[in-house]
Amino acid sequence: MNEIFAACAIASKKYLGLIPYDEQLTAAAELTKGRITEMKTGEGKTLCAAFAASYMAKNGHNVRILTFNDYLAKRDSEWMKPIYDALGISSACILHSTDIADKKEMYKNQIVYITAREAGFDFLRDFVANTPEDCVQTDFDFCIADEADSMMIDEARVPLVIAGETAVKPDEKLPEV
């Protein structure tokens, strides 16, 4: 972990002008263990998440960083990209407006920034896909949720629903009871 975090710190200082604090490194280390960490606004959650995501990606994991909205996904992805590039890690940002063909390619990156809502809808669309080729997501095994409390408590009350035509036609006559 020390070597990867050190490489992240060097890239962060060189390309972003940011030197991580001990608290950020501790929080990043906790994230790599699947633990929740609480950080207030302005304490460097974005950098912390990038360090944890980099560590996991360098160790063979496919990482999703879930944000609250498209603005944060785009901002954080673009801001942290120099760190990922310096470490040879592929990254992408999927927005609500991203078309299906582009999503398929973007999901192949080691680190993907996306809103929790969009990731949820992609999961549902893949679940009802007629063929494996119709699926857009790739497997991932590590997730970092920015604003986890908001996503898991506030947004959990809003269901994700997909509606549309199905390949299966309903019976014209219902059996008599």
Language model: regions and residue ranges:
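Conserved P-loop NTPase motor core
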Residues: 1-177
